Amino acid sequence: MGRGTWSWIVPDGLWEIAKPLIPPSRVRPQGGGTQDTPDETLFAAIIYVLVSGCAWRQLPPCFGISKSTAHRRFLIWSRAGVWGRLHEAVLHRLDDAGLIDVTRVVLDTAHVRAKKGGEHTGPSPVDRGKPGSKMHVLSDANGLPLLVGVSAGNTHDSEGLKPMVEGHQTRHDPHRGRYFKPQRLHADKAYDRADLRKWLRGKRIGVRIARKGIESSERLGRRRWVIERTMSWLSGYRRLSPRYERDPRNYLAFLGLAAALCC
């Protein structure tokens, strides 16, 4: 398979969205050197690592690039914020097509084992105290991931509610003529705190959080099932679960790319 033919790994249209976001490669002032690998090839290789979970050194020969080149470019693009902006650009496309529904948003968290430790890891209460992280996801009513985040495995789920809601409201461009405040927020009993309910109401967001020992999870689950599907999508990317990245910025970069792919 020739260079630049990556339809088997890159979804239709995604490269066209990503291409304007890629920072230009640095030009050697002295000239010379080997020819740069096409950005589209590097983009496909990074997606392959995310999907397969392989180490950089295990990239297939069909990409025609070294592990150091692929990893270095991933780090450069990650520090430039490419993956978060790609996710946001995909969301804008969907919103323009009327495919995002924020009448209801759904929040959930998943535990992820952290193989190598690092920042934003901690003893997991559901994995015998082994190092882990939590993946936080806010989706629209259809399960499209609107915002993703990561925290230590011993952080309570409820601690992620405020930053996720605030992050969703502030990251979208207000000049697009759309107000992104959700009308209602659905979450499970892990988020059942009086102060969070009061905070949401103060923002004029309807609260549909299951109450501990009172409300049936089955009834509220009619709205929350979409986030379970989204979590399943994200967990299917093998570079995310388990977590191999010691640097949380790298893990969040892969998570942002996965969110864009899920959309």
Residue ranges and their predicted role:
Residues M1-C263:
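Short alpha-helical elements
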